[in-house]
A protein has these predicted regions:
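Conserved active-site tyrosine of GNAT-family acetyltransferases
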Residues: 21, 121, 126
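Conserved GNAT acetyl-CoA-binding A-motif
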Residues: 94, 101-114
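Short amphipathic alpha-helix that is part of the acyltransferase structural core
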Residues: 1-43, 50-56
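C-terminal "cap" of GNAT-fold acetyltransferases
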Residues: 107, 114-116, 124-143
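Conserved acetyl-CoA-binding loop-helix of GNAT-fold acetyltransferases
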Residues: 80, 86-99
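A conserved beta-turn-beta hairpin within the catalytic core of GNAT-like acetyltransferases
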Residues: 65-76, 85, 131-135
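Conserved beta-strand in the GNAT
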Residues: 50, 56-65, 72-79
Length: 143
């Protein structure tokens, strides 16, 4: 199993990136308001990332540099296709994301986790710092 982290920076990469996010984060949750043209995707300091397993796109995440001087990165819009969930793909994605973030000077990652994803992040060493009922804020030092 070879999981690769790719920047979503070509036409095929963007198509796969948006298809995975639309399906996992919107369609499966009964939402229809996905916007693939949202300007945050192209802001300086935002890194839309695509993960492929043996050449097949299986997951996405975006790393936003919240405060580059303080070394803080925000993990956003994490999505793994359902058929690849609970197979170690999400954990491997987070490991590769941490390595990538470290190359950008990130020392701490934050994420507003879906309530049902909190145990996943806790297993990976994240800690809740704001237990909001909708999306708890979690953090993990990486540097």
């Amino acid at each position: 199993m070879e999981l690769r982290l790719l920047k979503a920076d070509d036409v095929d990469g963007w198509k796969a990136y948006h298809a995975i996010r639309r399906h996992v984060l919107f369609e499966l949750r009964g939402q229809e308001n996905y916007d693939p043209t949202h300007p945050d995707e192209h802001r300086e300091g935002h890194f839309p990332l695509l993960f492929s397993l043996d050449g097949t796109p299986v997951g996405t995440v975006r790393l936003d540099m919240a405060d580059a001087q303080a070394g803080v990165g925000i993990v956003r819009l994490v999505a793994v296709l359902p058929e690849y969930q609970r197979r170690g793909v999400g954990s491997a994605m987070m490991q590769r994301l941490q390595s990538f973030a470290a190359t950008k000077g990130v020392q701490r990652l934050d994420v507003h986790a879906a309530r049902n994803a909190v145990p996943f992040y806790e297993k990976l060493g994240w800690h809740v710092i704001d237990p909001s009922p909708d999306s708890p804020l979690m953090t993990k030092p990486i540097g």
